[in-house]
Amino acid sequence: MAALPGTVPRMMRPAPGQNYPRTGFPLEVSTPLGQGRVNQLGGVFINGRPLPNHIRHKIVEMAHHGIRPCVISRQLRVSHGCVSKILCRYQETGSIRPGAIGGSKPRQVATPDVEKKIEEYKRENPGMFSWEIRDRLLKDGHCDRSTVPSGLVSSISRVLRIKFGKKEEEDEADKKEDDGEKKAKHSIDGILGDKGNRLDEGSDVESEPDLPLKRKQRRSRTTFTAEQLEELEKAFERTHYPDIYTREELAQRTKLTEARVQVWFSNRRARWRKQAGANQLAAFNHLLPGGFPPTGMPTLPPYQLPDSTYPTTTISQDGGSTVHRPQPLPPSTMHQGGLAAAAAAADTSSAYGARHSFSSYSDSFMNPAAPSNHMNPVSNGLSPQVMSILGNPSAVPPQPQADFSISPLHGGLDSATSISASCSQRADSIKPGDSLPTSQAYCPPTYSTTGYSVDPVAGYQYGQYGQTAVDYLAKNVSLSTQRRMKLGEHSAVLGLLPVETGQAY
């Protein structure tokens, strides 16, 4: 049908069934109100303008029939937030009208008594200005300077607009209706006016749907039985994202709704992602020597070994009851590799072990070919050089017995015990353990006597770790002394530094 000459064809709204390209940028569509856009659901909207009235009616009708807001959003191609806001406002106020566009609501600063006086003054003198009404209120004593609101003039103007503006609008509407009746019905303006009136009547905002909606109540948590959980877990092992057919089949088998099944899978996927992240963190921590274990994993304190595996031997003293017992500290990280190296070198010093009757480590602890346990802090923290020493004990040269000999003295150790000749060059770099507590300080007897406690026990006992640490420290001092002597000889030959200095800075 061709349009009448001289008329502008009205743009029809696109039907909801049309498919719009879903790209990253919204598609612009021409609408009677201006440039519209297409949302991600394919629906047309105008930015900053309220949703059309017929769509608001449709939203309320669908909600009245029990359709969920998410389904309403997909079918009408309206955003979920818009649907929820319209339904919430309809439940609270019973109206589907949109709110005010921009601005803030005016403040009601004038009291009802003051408003009555304003109306009375306006009736007496219709040409009275707002500031004149304010002065009249102050003069008559209805308000004083301290109680006059700051926006009294604007409040008076608003009251005048509300009370007396309606009458003026009604008079203007009556005049327009009279002028419209005088126009011919067969004219172009009359035809378009009739069409416009019909469209306006169909989209009148004042026509409320008057449909009762169920008040949204908070749903109680669903409790699943063991049989239902078993069925759901089996389905979750097959797929984490079941389709609609799988969900409906599960709903029939478990006597649940399809929505409950969908929500259960969503929660189960979240729990699975959390568990997977925790497992990855635990696997990463196992790769690090000092990594923190997960919270649910039992841990053993490092260097806490049973006494039955490492027995101690008591050396009886004939002439006295005084015992000199070293109190070692727990080995630090710096000593981990050295403990294992010293224990490996104990095989080459069998004469020293037989002399003092000290028991060595078990084969399972010292065997390099034994399976590595992730809970063993010593084996995990070893460097490749230390592992090579463990695999080849003969690489460590045997030391003379004089470097390792510990001779307990009857009646206590002399405080002026001199350092052995092999350790004389190391004496300045070793600090005494005076600052440490006596019960926990560790010092070998060849260096100092401040780290020993005197107990009246008939017997001389060495802990396994104390003896191993003594061996390691003595061996370390001897090896470093030999290296420094060789370095001094090479430096003297090359003429780099005099031999007397001992160390270059």
UniProtKB/Swiss-Prot annotation:
Top-rank taxon, per record: Eukaryota
GO CC terms, sorted: chromatin; nucleus
Motif position, OAR: 479-491
Residues bearing the modification N6-acetyllysine: 105, 139
GO molecular function ontology, one term from the record: sequence-specific double-stranded DNA binding
RED subdomain: annotated segments: 113-163
Protein keywords: Acetylation, Chromosomal rearrangement, Developmental protein, Disease variant, DNA-binding, Homeobox, Myogenesis, Nucleus, Paired box, Proto-oncogene, Transcription, Transcription regulation
Cell compartments where the protein resides: Nucleus
DNA-binding annotation, residue ranges on this chain: 34-163, 217-276
Keyword Transcription: yes
Protein family membership: Belongs to the paired homeobox family.
Associated disease: Rhabdomyosarcoma 2: A form of rhabdomyosarcoma, a highly malignant tumor of striated muscle derived from primitive mesenchymal cells and exhibiting differentiation along rhabdomyoblastic lines. Rhabdomyosarcoma is one of the most frequently occurring soft tissue sarcomas and the most common in children. It occurs in four forms: alveolar, pleomorphic, embryonal and botryoidal rhabdomyosarcomas. Congenital myopathy 19: An autosomal recessive muscular disorder characterized by infantile onset of progressive muscular atrophy, hypotonia, ptosis, scoliosis and dysmorphic facial features. Disease severity is variable, ranging from mild to severe.
Quaternary assembly: Can bind to DNA as a heterodimer with PAX3. Interacts with PAXBP1; the interaction links PAX7 to a WDR5-containing histone methyltransferase complex. Interacts with DAXX.
Its biological purpose: Transcription factor that is involved in the regulation of muscle stem cells proliferation, playing a role in myogenesis and muscle regeneration.
Protein name in UniProt: Paired box protein Pax-7
Protein source organism: Homo sapiens
Taxonomic placement: Eukaryota, Metazoa, Chordata, Craniata, Vertebrata
